[in-house]
Amino acid sequence: MKRTFQPSNLVRKRRHGFRARMATASGRAILRNRRAKGRKKLSA
């Protein structure tokens, strides 16, 4: 059976990267919440 997680750094960056987050209003909200919480890493 094929596993669900097939790692790819390119897909990871495109889907969860900083620029992907900044591209949408909801993504910017995620970054805002993570900054408020004091996360060391904001995105992938």
Curated annotation (Swiss-Prot):
Any coiled-coil regions, as ranges: none
GO cellular component, one term: ribosome
Single GO term (MF): structural constituent of ribosome
Keyword terms of this UniProt record: Ribonucleoprotein, Ribosomal protein
Any Gene Ontology biological process: translation
Family: Belongs to the bacterial ribosomal protein bL34 family.
Name of the protein: Large ribosomal subunit protein bL34
Source species of the chain: Rickettsia bellii (strain OSU 85-389)
Species classification: Bacteria, Pseudomonadati, Pseudomonadota, Alphaproteobacteria, Rickettsiales
